Curated annotation (Swiss-Prot):
Location of the protein in the cell: Cell inner membrane
GO cellular component: plasma membrane
Keywords: Antibiotic resistance, Cell inner membrane, Cell membrane, Cell shape, Cell wall biogenesis/degradation, Hydrolase, Membrane, Peptidoglycan synthesis, Transmembrane, Transmembrane helix
Described function: Catalyzes the dephosphorylation of undecaprenyl diphosphate (UPP). Confers resistance to bacitracin.
Name this protein carries in UniProt: Undecaprenyl-diphosphatase
Keyword Ribonucleoprotein attributed: no
Entry's family note: Belongs to the UppP family.
Protein's GO biological process: cell wall organization; peptidoglycan biosynthetic process; regulation of cell shape; response to antibiotic
Highest taxon listed in the record's lineage: Bacteria
């Protein structure tokens, strides 16, 4: 497959799965397993690693564009509260929740970075992905069936942010999905579908941005005209498609539960496990 077409398709896959609770990283690995980049002038593994995180930044930018009014208004409120010019602490609490929510995965990810890199090299990675999709799907269906009532009015507070932050660490396991870990954990505490999804979006901004900066520094030696072109192209595709996917996703969950995503994970997990066992 031509590398430009490969980058285009990966950008679409990233955009379609990043903020859905189905694991974008798992889908990208599955695609690269069958359709790797060809004839690159740089080490393939390093470029694959950088490309995946780079196109995630495109998806992140779509969140910033879609929610810039919310992010900016909360920032203004936080600054005014910090300077003592306002008693409204909602903006300050918003960003405090985000900081608390990202610290566990940043710390654990840093401590385990060498082990996490080794996981991608394992011969049984497909089995790990399949099991993660399957088990995560069962948990998602179970949680949604128990929390279909949206009348509790529970919102994301400091305590909820801590719990979501720690449970987000499970997303370090390939196939678990950062979105699934954060959404499911919020839903178990009675938070609405909308608030659970949006908090997951907001958590992704600092987590994936910092991960992108780290990967860019780590693989800086492979940057050249060929790789930069593919990275930017994939990111632009991811940004454009993800902008519309998020809007469709939010419209979907206003009417439906997350059960369909759980069923999808179960079926995909079974297919991947069967493929691994057979081949």
């Amino acid at each position: 497959m031509d590398n430009t077409l490969n980058a285009f398709l990966r950008g679409i896959i990233e955009a379609a799965t990043e903020f859905l609770p189905v694991s974008s990283t798992g889908h990208l690995f599955l695609f690269s397993y069958f359709f790797p980049f060809q004839n690159l002038s740089v080490p393939h593994e390093a470029f694959e690693d950088l490309f995946d995180i780079f196109i995630q930044t495109g998806a992140i930018l779509s969140v910033v564009v879609l929610y810039y009014k919310t992010l900016w208004s909360h920032l203004v409120e936080a600054v005014r509260f910090g300077l003592g010019k306002s008693t409204d602490r909602s903006g300050f609490q918003f960003y405090l929740n985000l900081i608390v929510g990202i610290l566990p995965i940043l710390i654990l990810g840093f401590l385990l970075k060498s082990q996490l890199d080794q996981i991608k090299m394992r011969s049984d990675l497909l089995l790990i992905l399949g099991m993660s999709w399957f088990v995560g799907g069962i948990i998602m269906v179970f949680v949604e069936k128990r929390h279909l009532d949206e009348s509790s009015g529970k919102t994301i507070g400091f305590k909820e942010s801590i719990i979501v932050g720690f449970l987000q660490c499970f997303a370090l396991i390939p196939g678990v999905s950062r979105s699934a870990a954060t959404i499911i954990s919020a839903r178990t505490m009675g938070v609405s579908k909308k608030d659970s999804a949006e908090f997951s979006f907001f958590l992704a901004i600092p987590v994936l941005t910092l991960a992108g900066i780290y990967k860019l520094y780590k693989h800086r030696q492979i940057l050249n005209s060929e790789t930069i072109g593919l990275l930017l192209f994939g990111s632009i595709i991811s940004f454009i498609i993800c902008y519309f996917i998020i809007r469709l996703f939010m419209a979907f969950i206003r009417r439906r539960s997350f059960i369909s995503f759980g069923v999808y994970r179960i079926l995909l997990g079974l297919l991947v496990i069967l493929y691994f066992v057979r081949y």
